[in-house]
UniProtKB/Swiss-Prot annotation:
A lipid is attached at residue 16 (S-diacylglycerol cysteine). It is a lipid-anchor. A lipid is attached at residue 16 (N-palmitoyl cysteine). GO terms for biological process: bacterial-type flagellum-dependent cell motility. GO terms for molecular function: cytoskeletal motor activity. The gene is flgH. InterPro entries: Flag_Lring. This is Flagellar L-ring protein. It comes from Aliivibrio fischeri (strain ATCC 700601 / ES114).
């Protein structure tokens, strides 16, 4: 009996210890997933979960702050220019040439994106169709006399048909987005281009507003003050939206959406 109790106690302690000690490979996988280049619009669909009946009625899944897919980048190794403090006023490792720049070039460096998106679209079309048909036949004559039926009707007819169609349509759409967001370099490509990704969350009263951005930039397009225009980003994915009560009031309910589709 004592041996059985000791065995159970040992098993329990071992299980608790297993829960406390985390597998290093699991930590590595979490870091890898955190540094994945995720689309700013689509998000990380691999980890989407059902948020309950409220989100089902809303018809959308709101993103959350602190998503591991958008976590900051933390380089494991120290940068090449890093050096321990020696107490000297001059350190060659911290020296910067007069003609050198401080543009982001490595993993984890930051750059500020100036949002200046303006798009306009206008389209119109006019169509006009018309068709006219006329057909007639003179009365039949036999021996110089009209051939009649019953003394009242002759064999003649006259037909006319007119068809007219006029249609016009027009569509106008414009979008504007201005502001700024600071993002991080998550990968350096072989040609020197930089993959960037970042998000900004603002808590305002009863809801949150967020901006997410990802894309590819060239170091040459970065300005001297470490900023770059959003129009210089290749494969840009920009998402600006919100969550909470104010966002819910801007969208129709699920019954309204159902009848809009059904009817």
């Amino acid at each position: 009996m004592k041996r059985l109790l000791c065995l159970l106690l040992l098993t329990t302690l071992t299980g608790c210890e297993t829960l406390l000690i985390k597998n290093p490979s699991a930590q590595e996988s979490e870091v890898t997933s955190a540094t994945t280049n995720v689309d700013a619009v689509e998000g990380d669909k691999a980890k989407e979960e059902d948020s309950g009946i409220i989100d089902t009625l809303r018809g959308r899944n709101d993103p959350i702050a602190g998503d591991p897919a958008w976590a900051p980048i933390h380089p494991k190794e120290k940068p090449e220019h890093y050096a321990a403090a020696t107490g000297s006023l001059f350190n060659v490792d911290h020296a910067q040439d007069m003609y050198d720049d401080t543009k982001p070039r490595g993993l984890g460096d930051i750059v500020t994106v100036m949002l200046a998106e303006n798009t306009k679209a206008a389209k119109s079309a006019d169509a006009e169709l018309s068709k006219s048909n006329d057909s007639s036949m003179d009365p039949l004559q036999v021996g110089g006399q009209e051939l009649q039926m019953g003394g009242q009707y002759n064999f003649s007819y006259e037909l006319s048909n007119d068809n007219n169609f006029t249609g016009n349509t027009s569509a106008n759409q414009s979008n504007s987005l201005s502001g700024s967001i600071t993002v991080e370099v998550i990968e350096v490509l072989s040609n020197g281009n930089l993959l960037i990704r970042g998000e900004k969350w603002l808590t305002l009263n009863t809801g949150d507003e967020y901006i997410r951005l990802s894309g590819t930039i060239r170091p040459d397009d970065i300005n001297f003050d470490n900023t770059i225009d959003s129009t210089r980003i290749s494969n840009a994915r920009i998402q600006y939206s919100g969550t909470g009560d104010q966002q819910d009031m801007q969208e129709p309910g699920f019954l309204a959406r159902f009848f809009n589709v059904a009817l």
